[in-house]
Amino acid sequence: MSNLSTALNLVPSETQLPVSAYFDEALYQTEIERLFKHGPSYVGHELMVPEVGDYHTLAAEAEGRVLVRNPNGVELLSNVCRHRQAIMLNGRGNAQNIVCPLHRWTYDLKGELLGAPHFERQPCVHLSRSLLQNWNGLLFEGKRDVRNDLARLGVARDLDFSGYMLDHVEVHDCDYNWKTFIEVYLEDYHVVPFHPGLGQFVSCDDLTWEFGEWYSVQTVGIHAGLRKPGTATYQKWHDAVLRFNNGEMPKYGAVWLTYYPNVMVEWYPNVLVVSTLHPMGPGKTRNVVEFYYPEEIVLFEREFVEAERAAYMETCIEDDEIAERMDAGRLALLRRGTSEVGPYQSPMEDGMQHFHEWYRRVMDY
């Protein structure tokens, strides 16, 4: 295991955030401007639209924009008609053109207006589009240089989506601050006491950390050869992994990359997950979770997919309880007019400490 306190010479008492940081509206607005609008801004994966004509609306934006694959590649277009500002496409599918259902205004797959019925002179308008960066198929529209940020990432090859397909997307709303989500995600101290299923699937005794200026990575091993499932849900997941791999142990139990402030890319046996946080207020966070599997599994192994999804969501609900308890306690302290912070457990909470240090640096806080 690595020790971040030694590696970065951080002083724990100076990096923890006061309880007010999780509820302050003015600070929240500053976070949106400094961290999110100037961050990497992940919008989706190219596997969402594998074929020409494929489209996939952005769930996090109430379908206000859409990923479209045209003959030139993948583009991010506005999904709002230039006539009466109606949402045009819903969900995912394939189309030759983008047609507004209200008045049949029609755009090509590059967003150019092709036709506006009953207009003597066609309006000179088009759908707005955004420039995209591509890293391992992940698409970003932000101002950061994503390739530079992740250039030294040691697990990049493990996060290779070649041969994978998008299976489904979960939208999960959380009743707590986005920073609390990241804190829970970046500490392994709670895995054994609070996650009976996950705690018997992965081994935090094998925890290793990797840190970059804008990211951290946790890698954990497989627990006891998957011989002792902790819950009935995880029993099915253990069985699915062992069956698909013919009894051979996977390389890892899990790999969890956090690209600050809000993008998480996760490796599990024969699974890749992209999870993105979208703050909706100091006490509300939307998590959009994309599940990718090898093509063979998506097409022929539904039991594997359902077992993994159920295990993932079981742990997700448990994490919700942790985060809700943390923010409830912080709110109680805030109302009492005080603030308290505790020490970091190293190495299991090194990631949380790294996040706090990053936050203070970028926010100048």
UniProtKB/Swiss-Prot annotation:
Keywords: 2Fe-2S, Iron, Iron-sulfur, Metal-binding, Monooxygenase, Oxidoreductase
GO terms, molecular function: 2 iron, 2 sulfur cluster binding; iron ion binding; monooxygenase activity
EC number: 1.14.-.-
Record note on cofactor: Binds 1 [2Fe-2S] cluster per subunit.
Cystine crosslinks: none
Transmembrane segment boundaries: none
Major enzyme class: oxidoreductase
Binding sites annotated in the UniProt record for [2Fe-2S] cluster: 81, 83, 100, 103
Cofactor: [2Fe-2S] cluster
The keyword Metal-binding is annotated on this UniProt entry: yes
Gene deletion effect: Deletion of the gene abolishes the production of 2-hydroxyputrescine. Depletion of 2-hydroxyputrescine has no discernible effect on growth of the deletion mutant.
Signal sequence region: none
Reported function: Rieske-type iron sulfur protein that can catalyze in vitro the 2-hydroxylation of putrescine, forming 2-hydroxyputrescine. May be involved in the biosynthesis of the cyclic hydroxamate siderophore alcaligin.
Family in the record: Belongs to the bacterial ring-hydroxylating dioxygenase alpha subunit family.
Protein name as annotated: Putrescine 2-hydroxylase
Organism: Ralstonia nicotianae (strain ATCC BAA-1114 / GMI1000)
Organism lineage: Bacteria, Pseudomonadati, Pseudomonadota, Betaproteobacteria, Burkholderiales
